[in-house]
A protein has these predicted regions:
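Short, small-residue-biased leader/transition segments that mark boundaries at the very start
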Residues: 1-3
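Short alpha-helical "recognition helix" segments of helix-turn-helix
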Residues: 77-86
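Active-site acidic catalytic loop and adjacent metal/ATP-binding pocket
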Residues: 128-136, 140, 169, 265-311
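ATP-binding pocket architecture of kinase catalytic cores
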Residues: 135-225
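A cross-family kinase active-site recognition segment
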Residues: 201-254, 276
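Active-site activation/catalytic loop segments of kinase-like enzymes and analogous catalytic loops
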Residues: 310-349, 364-381
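ATP/Mg2+ or Mg2+-diphosphate-binding catalytic cores
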Residues: 370-410
């Protein structure tokens, strides 16, 4: 077996043939012989190898297909998905069918674990990666992280006791708040009426209401803090901690180091002046339900923590940019939503001048968080998308500040 080493000299291709047995370990030669024997193999020069190896490409396809399936569960049509991912409708259908097969074993587990609750046999329908609708009245959610499970249970219980609109926990036959097997933890809650909004940019009243709803949740959270201990977190500490470590480990692949340090410096100057309290931490349209234009309930407190209050506001607005293809939101419409959303929030709960001034910095820091997180997940496409959102906010800092400053006068 030979390996071909090829290089160019004055336009001519010079080929050096070398016996693989003289270069490679016997075990490696035997491994290669399982794929090819008696033929020449070209091994490219290392620095000319494409950045994306076949393995990385396959990982990208896996991530893409997972995203497609998740969005289909969220109600995005096959034709919309085909346009978003530049695939044919038949390809989208094939991907969804394949992904659904992968969840069949989990569906069977759900049907079994439901016996832990004293409810009638119901149809099981997957509605999210980790959530199943049970009949018309319940939602079952799965967890691998018991801390995340207990955090959600704690907050749901406190909010329900205060009359806040959340899906109440249904106790098991043994009067426990959750069930478990060898792999997962399960929590069953009453299903709230309503659904998430998909056309938020077409209704400024709903946008304003969304701001009010978040403000009311923050007020309730503030009152809840005295009833128990909650996870303390800090966006600034994350920036100086694991986020920076990921960027250093990856040689600042997407992020300019000086831009990162400059953002941290600006954030540090104002951070101690920003109010800290219990926040939702995952504010997006899927977690706030509306029924015929009226707010009907909050869901999913898995990530709730004590952090800067404006994190939730910034996170929500950034989420609209990350879903712009689904929601069909232009930059101009996003700025309009920003105005009504902050105006609605401040009708219920005033923001400090320092909070408003920090909004662009917090938005940019959140996107750096997502770039780092997606890099750790080997999700290159989402990491690049997060970087684009950061660049959009950084480019439009003055516009963001101007709109927020004027929102109270709107």
């Amino acid at each position: 077996m030979c390996i071909r080493d090829r290089y160019y000299t004055k336009g001519a291709v010079i080929v050096n043939y070398k016996n693989a047995n003289h270069i490679l370990p016997d075990r490696l030669v035997q491994e290669i012989q399982q794929y090819v024997q008696g033929e020449y193999i070209y091994i490219p020069i290392k620095d000319k190898v494409m950045n994306t190896s076949p393995t990385e490409y396959e990982q990208e396809l896996i991530k893409r297909n997972e995203h497609i399936y998740t969005k289909s569960l969220e109600g995005i049509s096959n034709s919309e998905l085909a346009n978003m991912y530049h695939l044919s409708a038949s390809s989208i259908r094939r991907i969804i069918i394949e992904q659904r097969k992968g969840y069949e074993a989990m569906n069977n587990k759900i049907r079994q674990i439901i016996n832990e609750w004293d409810i009638e046999k119901k149809d099981v329908k997957q509605i999210y990666d980790s959530a199943w609708q049970i009949g018309e009245d319940y939602v079952l959610k799965t967890y691998e992280d018991v801390n995340m499970l207990q955090r959600n249970i704690k907050i749901l219980t406190i909010l329900e006791d205060r009359g806040i609109q959340v899906g109440g926990i249904v106790l098991t036959k043994d009067r426990k708040t959750y069930a478990k097997d060898t792999e997962y933890y399960y929590i069953l809650t009453n299903k709230l009426v309503g659904s998430n909004i998909t056309n938020i940019h077409k209704d400024t009243v709903i946008v304003s209401e969304m701001g009010k709803v978040l403000a009311r949740l923050h007020k309730a959270f503030k009152e809840c803090e005295t009833q128990d201990e909650f996870w303390d977190n800090s966006l600034l500490k994350e920036m100086n901690g694991w986020i920076k470590e990921v960027f250093v480990k990856n040689s600042w692949k997407y992020i300019d180091e000086s831009a990162f340090c400059n953002l941290v410096d600006r954030l540090e100057k104002v951070y101690d002046k920003l109010p800290v309290q219990l926040i939702h931490r995952d504010v997006h349209l899927g977690n706030f339900l509306f029924d015929n234009g009226k707010f009907s309930g909050y869901i999913d407190f898995d990530l709730s923590q004590r952090n800067i209050r404006i994190f939730d506001l910034c996170y929500f607005m950034l989420g609209l940019l990350s879903e712009e293809e689904v929601l069909d939101i232009s930059a101009e419409q996003w700025f309009e939503i920003l105005k009504y959303f902050f105006a609605g929030y401040e009708q219920e709960h005033k923001l400090l001048p320092e909070e408003k001034q920090a909004v662009p910095y917090v938005m940019e820091a959140i996107e750096f968080l997502f770039v780092a997180w997606f890099m750790e997940q080997n999700d290159i496409k989402c990491a690049e998308d997060a970087m684009k959102i950061y660049q959009f906010v950084e480019k439009n800092e003055e516009m963001v500040l101007k709109i927020i400053d004027n929102s109270t006068h709107f």
